[in-house]
Amino acid sequence: MWNEFKKFALKGNVMDLAVGVVIGGAFGKIVSSLVSDVIMPLVGLLLGGVNFTGLSFTFGKAVVKYGAFIQTVVDFLIIAFSIFLFIKLFNKLTFKKEEEKKEEVPEPTKEEVLLGEIRDLLKQQNASKDRA
């Protein structure tokens, strides 16, 4: 059971996923800081000095912090757009590699050409026997 688990855990896909999760978590923190510390203060400044973190209203005893929600939406949009660009770049690079592989088809060797001619002759002979 232990050996089977080691095989599973050390597969390339599992390790890639683990690295992706760790990097994704760190990237999320960077984007959150970018949104809350850089983008939203600038947007607030452009809108007349609005501080989005303090935007809220009280409904009875409940406090609805819609400013924090707006920051979270902007945070999500930036992360989603970044992932979109990354996947688009990845697909573009992968597609180029596939095109290069298709272009690198080697020409048939003399033996392969000769075997192809023999195959064609045998097909012709079998076709003429079937007609007769």
UniProtKB/Swiss-Prot annotation:
Keywords noted in UniProt: Cell membrane, Ion channel, Ion transport, Membrane, Transmembrane, Transmembrane helix, Transport
InterPro entries for the chain: Mechanosensitive_channel_CS, MS_channel, MSC/AndL, MscL_channel
Membrane protein topology class: Multi-pass membrane protein
Pfam families listed in its UniProt record: MscL (PF01741)
Gene3D superfamilies cross-referenced by the UniProt entry: Large-conductance mechanosensitive channel, MscL, domain 1 (1.10.1200.120)
Transmembrane segments: 8-28, 30-50, 67-87
Compartmental location: Cell membrane
Subunit and partners: Homopentamer.
UniProt family annotation: Belongs to the MscL family.
Function: Channel that opens in response to stretch forces in the membrane lipid bilayer. May participate in the regulation of osmotic pressure changes within the cell.
Protein name from the UniProt record: Large-conductance mechanosensitive channel
Organism from which the protein derives: Bacillus cytotoxicus (strain DSM 22905 / CIP 110041 / 391-98 / NVH 391-98)
Encoding gene (name): mscL
